[in-house]
């Protein structure tokens, strides 16, 4: 018997990511699923834990970690609620603004609680972001193409935004493309973040994919990561659940918990 299991609440358990995460937690010897947040009418009898419709019903639940795999429009409120009630948030929902992340980090420090907002839980995607950060020192001309299933609500993806932000830390100030470039169709060249172009693709059959394409005189470099199914995110989620128990503030990005 394993003592001191980490007690986990899962918000958003009915989604594809959420249902996969629930099974991972149920099968993990060091985790204990203690509650679910979602619509009760859709609950399978296989879940032998309480299910709540409203987060306020969880105020007195005994738990360590709040795993949030909900939707961008509620993720900030959910994360704040978790911290406010002494739970360590592990958040896979994207769409946070820079200001929202800053406020949550500040609040977590006040509460002395660990937490994690991860634009991507796939270890390969985290490595892609770190490799891109190194490559941009030598290849400042770069564009990002992110590809996801057609049910994804936000664009560009949190992974693409995080990749651009990391590259901006190392990329020299640089004008990319023709000075007199004009779009004959608005948006044809994609969105711009930190001087880099991001292109979003949404198609059925895709899960989560990203290319970072670098160009230079006479050569090019393409870095790509593919998640073929949602099991690719479970190692990172499990790592996040364990690691937030060891820190006293919220981190933005799974790379903070890897030896990179």
Swiss-Prot record:
Pfam families: DapB_C, DapB_N
Subcellular location: Cytoplasm
Biological process terms in GO annotation: diaminopimelate biosynthetic process; lysine biosynthetic process via diaminopimelate
Subcellular location, principal: cytoplasm
Keywords: Amino-acid biosynthesis, Cytoplasm, Diaminopimelate biosynthesis, Lysine biosynthesis, NAD, NADP, Oxidoreductase
Pathway: Amino-acid biosynthesis; L-lysine biosynthesis via DAP pathway; (S)-tetrahydrodipicolinate from L-aspartate: step 4/4
Positions with a binding annotation for (S)-2,3,4,5-tetrahydrodipicolinate: 149, 158-159
Protein name, per record: 4-hydroxy-tetrahydrodipicolinate reductase
Gene (UniProt): dapB
């Amino acid at each position: 018997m394993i003592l001191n299991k980490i007690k986990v609440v899962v918000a958003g358990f009915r989604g594809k990511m959420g249902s996969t995460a629930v099974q991972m937690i149920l099968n993990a010897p060091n985790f204990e699923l203690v509650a679910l947040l979602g619509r009760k009418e859709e609950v399978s009898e296989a879940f032998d834990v309480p299910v709540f419709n409203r987060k306020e019903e969880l105020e007195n639940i005994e738990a360590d970690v709040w795993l949030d795999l909900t939707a961008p429009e509620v993720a900030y409120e959910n994360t704040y609620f978790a911290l406010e009630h002494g739970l360590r948030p592990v958040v896979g929902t994207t769409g946070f603004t820079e200001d929202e992340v800053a406020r949550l980090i500040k609040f977590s420090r006040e509460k002395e609680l660990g937490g994690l907002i991860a634009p991507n839980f796939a270890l390969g995607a985290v490595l892609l972001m770190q490799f891109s950060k190194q490559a941009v020192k030598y290849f400042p001309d770069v564009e990002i193409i992110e590809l996801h299933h057609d049910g994804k609500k936000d664009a560009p993806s949190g992974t693409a935004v995080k990749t651009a932000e990391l590259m901006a830390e190392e990329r020299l100030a640089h004008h990319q493309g023709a000075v007199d470039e004009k779009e004959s169709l608005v948006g044809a060249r994609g969105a711009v973040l930190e001087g880099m172009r991001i292109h979003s693709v949404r198609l059925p059959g895709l899960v989560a994919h990203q290319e970072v394409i670098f160009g230079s005189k006479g050569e090019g470099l393409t870095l790509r990561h593919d998640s073929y199914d949602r099991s690719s995110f479970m190692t990172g989620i499990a790592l996040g659940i364990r690691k937030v128990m060891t820190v006293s503030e919220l981190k933005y990005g799974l790379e903070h918990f890897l030896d990179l």
